[in-house]
Each structure stands twice: as structure tokens, then as C-alpha cells.
Amino acid sequence: MNTVPRYAVFGNPVAHSKSPQIHRQFALQEGVEIEYERICADTGGFAQAVEAFFADGGRGANVTVPFKQEAFALSDEHSERALAAGAVNTLILLENGKIRGDNTDGIGLTDDISKRLGVELSGKTVLLLGAGGAVRGVIPVLKEYRPARIVIANRTHTKAAEMAAHFGIEAIPLDELEGGFDIIINGTSGGLSGQLPAVSPKVFEHCTLAYDMVYGEAAEPFLAFARQSGAKQTADGLGMLVGQAAASYRLWRGFAPDVLPVVQYMREL
């Protein structure tokens, strides 16, 4: 019988996921051996795939696109963060056999901005571009930092307005945005196809930090546009990725990994 603790990330597609490399680095820090695999679940077959994984000895799992809402529905109980987001990216198998759902995306983002990058969130004006699951997942934790103002802008304004109403924040149409934002966070997936959010350069005039939730080359179109438009500092989402993974690892194993060396390691791959 295999006694090495097993973990996995579920998604579709999932072959590109860096989670196995990240969690192997965390295990090295803890001084333990773990198995961490990628599992591509079929659309409509997510619940069965998760149940089979846990039945076969799995201890915990990460969940990525497009299954975060399904993971929420699958969970027997939820953290407050997961309840607020309506989405789950971390599944924990409890001793009683039940599955607990959590969402560590918001921690990954806010820790990266406030701790690694040293940018204050409290009292600042924050613009979120996009109104999909990535943005929804981070708003509850972002609100805990008490920014002076959080605004959502999205290509489809009605979607942004609905999300803003749900969380008690603001929504402004993309073409009506003006400057005055301290922190601008791109939560759209446009960079993956080289597309930019349809915002005016003047939106970045007073921007302290422009941040893209995606990482590497996919983040560069937005970050380059932000720099050219006046943003003082830019960052991609690699630190968020490692940070949310570290929070998941801690939930599973009670060990808090050091994020910074793993961000540096992943950057050099």
C-alpha cells in the first residue's frame, strides 16, 4: 500500500499547470515526500473524478478552471472565504470522510501585493478589470484589507454590475473609466491571446501598481501597456500562484511554506 501522501490539481486543460513543481518545492522545505499529479477531468465528470481520487487515497486537491463552482457544490462544508466567493480552489479530505472546500486565491493575491511587493492596500483605490471567477474569488479577502474604494469594470457591464451589487462595491463601464486608481488588477484572460482590456491609457496616470493575475509572457501585453501609460510598478501573477498554493499546502499539512524562494525558483525554470 502506498503511504506517500497524494495530492492533485483538477482542471481542463491542466497539462500546463505548474502546481506539481510548486508543491514539490514546499515538500522539500517541510522535509517530506509527497505525490502531486495533474488530473484532467472531463466536462461533466468532475465530481466522479474527485470522488475516485479520494477513494484511492488522495488527501487533498487543488481545483482550477473550469471546475471551481462545481468544487463548491461538491464540498460538504465550506470556509467563510469560499462561501463569500461562491467558488472553491482547495479541497481537503477530513478525518470523518467529508470534503471541506476553501478558496485561497484571495490570500495568494493580497499576500503577494502587501507582503512580497510591499504595496499597501488599506485606504487605497483599487480597480479590478474583469468579472469572471478569478475576480470573484479574490474580492472577499481584498475587502478585508479595507481599501478606500473597489471598482469592477468589465467588457459586459451588466456582469460587473451584478458582481458589484453582490459584494457591495462599485461597477463602472470600461469606456467611462478615468484615472485616480492606486492599484489596477487585471483579472481578464485576454493576455493569453494577446488582447488588452479596452481601457484608456489615462486610467494608469496615478497608478502605483499594475498587476496581472496571469504570469509570464501572457501578462506582458497588459503590463507593458500599463508601464507605457504611467504605472510606477508592474507585476505578474506568479507570486499569487505560489501564494495560493502555499495556503492550500498549509490547509492540508499544517506546514506554512516560505513563498519567496519558490517564486524565485519558478521564475528561473
From Swiss-Prot:
GO terms for biological process: amino acid biosynthetic process; aromatic amino acid family biosynthetic process; chorismate biosynthetic process; shikimate metabolic process. Keywords: Amino-acid biosynthesis, Aromatic amino acid biosynthesis, NADP, Oxidoreductase. Pathway: Metabolic intermediate biosynthesis; chorismate biosynthesis; chorismate from D-erythrose 4-phosphate and phosphoenolpyruvate: step 4/7. Its EC number is 1.1.1.25. CDD domains: NAD_bind_Shikimate_DH. NADP(+) binds at E80, G130, A131, G132, G133, A134, N154, R155, T156, H157, T158, K159, M213, G237. Coiled coil: none annotated. The keyword NADP applies. The active site is at K68 (proton acceptor). GO terms for cellular component: cytosol. Pfam families: SDH_C, Shikimate_DH, Shikimate_dh_N. InterPro entries: Aminoacid_DH-like_N_sf (IPR046346), NAD(P)-bd_dom_sf (IPR036291), SDH_C (IPR041121), Shikimate_DH (IPR011342), Shikimate_DH-bd_N (IPR013708), Shikimate_DH_fam (IPR022893), Shikm_DH/Glu-tRNA_Rdtase (IPR006151). Shikimate binds at S17, K18, S19, T64, N89, D105, Y215. It catalyses: shikimate + NADP(+) = 3-dehydroshikimate + NADPH + H(+). It is an enzyme of class 1 (oxidoreductase). One of its GO terms (molecular function) is shikimate 3-dehydrogenase (NADP+) activity. Belongs to the shikimate dehydrogenase family. Homodimer. Involved in the biosynthesis of the chorismate, which leads to the biosynthesis of aromatic amino acids. Catalyzes the reversible NADPH linked reduction of 3-dehydroshikimate (DHSA) to yield shikimate (SA). This is Shikimate dehydrogenase (NADP(+)). It comes from Neisseria mucosa. The lineage of its organism: Bacteria, Pseudomonadati, Pseudomonadota, Betaproteobacteria, Neisseriales.
